């Protein structure tokens, strides 16, 4: 509790009480009663606060205070009251006439608590210590089980994380699981096919050709867009020979080819074929010396899906894109240089329109 306001207004004494102060307080309360404790110091002529006078009277100067040690009956009563009220010492003291709360608290902490422990009784719960320890031992396994269950709940996520790490750390080469052909880019810019017969065992059975009901496309489709890029007006460009710009609308041709050996790739530097399990990798030559190939032929990259192939006699599917550059080659000196004023705006407008037409025609054709 905080001090009364009178303690801050004037200088009051603190500490031990002198015999003269005890006599003044005892005489005043005996003759007039204590009344309001805040007014007692002024009426008794003491330089003390009201709280100090009250505590001095209750704990030391009361005529009904019992002096001496506590009897065994009082100790047993204190134990019974503590089991019901706990550490409420003032309420316990009200049940023991002539005893103060301070005396009871000191007796509890000094002697009664030790006696209860020697008897095997917990001073806090007033139960046998064996029961309290067994109860605490039962709580420990439950907490450990909760921790284990929490770890068990976390284990699937960790295992899923390990599974994700297993797949994420693998190289993203789908050719090991599907019928994609691998390409070896040599120094002469030739492309050769390297197949591995051991990859057939890694393909799931649902993706095997025998289990497929039908082929996605029964006949091969060859999409051949022909695009003519406009030349620039710069005289130093090898593609720009004049002020004319010739554009060819995209021409999408759909044709079927019933012969594997008559396609476009037989006369150039591409040796592409559907992976055949009967042919081993030793029959395919990895390195070939090819003739000069046009730049537009390097863009012809067929994309095979092994799961859509029904048998060895099914026809290949490839997309053939050719880009024709129509320009006057008489003044070719520098490739792909653009005019700063007219070339960029004209070509960008033409290309955007041309690409829109290509997208529309390609969507309608497929």
From Swiss-Prot:
Principal subcellular localisation of the protein: nucleus
Q: Please state every residue range assigned to the domain named HTH myb-type.
A: 9-61, 62-116
The subcellular location is: Nucleus
Cite the Pfam families for this sequence: Myb_DNA-binding
**DNA-binding positions:** 37-61, 89-112
Region Disordered: start-end pairs: 115-164
Gene Ontology process terms (BP): phloem or xylem histogenesis; regulation of stomatal movement; root development; seed coat development; xylem development
Against InterPro entries, the record matches this protein to: Homeodomain-like_sf, Myb_dom, Plant_SW-associated_TFs, SANT/Myb
Sequence ranges of Basic and acidic residues compositional bias: 124-141
Q: Where are the transmembrane segments?
A: none
Which GO cellular component terms, listed alphabetically, does the Swiss-Prot or TrEMBL entry include? nucleus
Q: Among its keywords, does the record have Electron transport?
A: no
Annotated knockout phenotype: Increased stomatal pore opening. Reduced amount of seed mucilage. Early germination, slow growth, delayed flowering and senescence.
Could you tell me in which tissues this protein is expressed?
Expressed specifically in guard cells. Expressed in sink tissues, such as xylem, roots and developing seeds.
Protein keywords: Developmental protein, DNA-binding, Nucleus, Repeat, Transcription, Transcription regulation
Query: What GO terms are given for molecular function?
Result: DNA-binding transcription factor activity; transcription cis-regulatory region binding
Q: Which SUPFAM superfamilies match?
A: Homeodomain-like (SSF46689)
Primary role? Transcription factor that coordinates a small network of downstream target genes required for several aspects of plant growth and development, such as xylem formation and xylem cell differentiation, and lateral root formation. Regulates a specific set of target genes by binding DNA to the AC cis-element 5'-ACCTAC-3'. Functions as a transcriptional regulator of stomatal closure. Plays a role the regulation of stomatal pore size independently of abscisic acid (ABA). Required for seed coat mucilage deposition during the development of the seed coat epidermis.
Q: Which protein, by its recorded name, is this?
A: Transcription factor MYB61
Q: Which organism is it from?
A: Arabidopsis thaliana
This protein's gene is called MYB61
């Amino acid at each position: 509790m905080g001090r009364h306001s009178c303690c801050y207004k004037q200088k009051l004494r603190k500490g031990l009480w002198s015999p003269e102060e005890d006599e003044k307080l005892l005489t005043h309360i005996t003759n007039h009663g204590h009344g309001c404790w805040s007014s007692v110091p002024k009426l008794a002529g003491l330089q003390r606060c009201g709280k100090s006078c009250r505590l001095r009277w209750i704990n030391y100067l009361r005529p009904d205070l019992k002096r001496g040690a506590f009897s065994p009956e009082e100790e047993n009563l204190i134990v019974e009251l503590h089991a019901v009220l706990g550490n409420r010492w003032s309420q316990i003291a009200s049940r023991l006439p002539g005893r103060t709360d301070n005396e009871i608290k000191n007796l509890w902490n000094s002697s009664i608590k030790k006696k209860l422990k020697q008897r095997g009784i917990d001073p806090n719960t007033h139960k046998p210590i064996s029961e309290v320890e067994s109860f605490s031992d039962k709580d420990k396994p439950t907490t450990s089980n909760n921790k284990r269950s929490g770890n068990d709940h976390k284990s699937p996520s960790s295992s899923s994380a390990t599974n994700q790490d297993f797949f994420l750390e693998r190289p993203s080469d789908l050719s090991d699981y599907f019928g994609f052909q691998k390409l070896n880019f040599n120094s002469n810019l030739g492309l050769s096919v390297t197949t591995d017969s051991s990859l057939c065992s890694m393909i799931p059975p649902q993706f095997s050709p025998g289990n497929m009901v039908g082929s996605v496309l029964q006949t091969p489709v060859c999409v051949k867009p022909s695009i003519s890029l406009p030349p620039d007006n710069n005289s130093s460009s090898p593609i720009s020979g004049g002020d004319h710009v010739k554009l060819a609308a995209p021409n999408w041709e759909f044709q079927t080819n019933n012969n594997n050996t008559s396609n476009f790739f037989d006369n150039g530097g591409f040796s592409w074929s559907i992976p055949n399990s009967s042919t081993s990798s030793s029959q395919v030559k990895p390195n070939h010396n090819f003739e000069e190939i046009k730049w537009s032929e390097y863009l012809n990259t067929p994309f095979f899906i092994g799961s859509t192939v029904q048998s060895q006699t099914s026809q290949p599917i490839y997309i053939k894109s050719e880009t024709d550059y129509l320009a006057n080659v008489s003044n070719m000196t520098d490739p792909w240089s653009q005019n700063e004023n007219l070339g960029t705006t004209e070509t960008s407008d033409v290309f955007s329109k041309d690409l829109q037409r290509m997208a529309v025609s390609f969507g309608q054709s497929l």
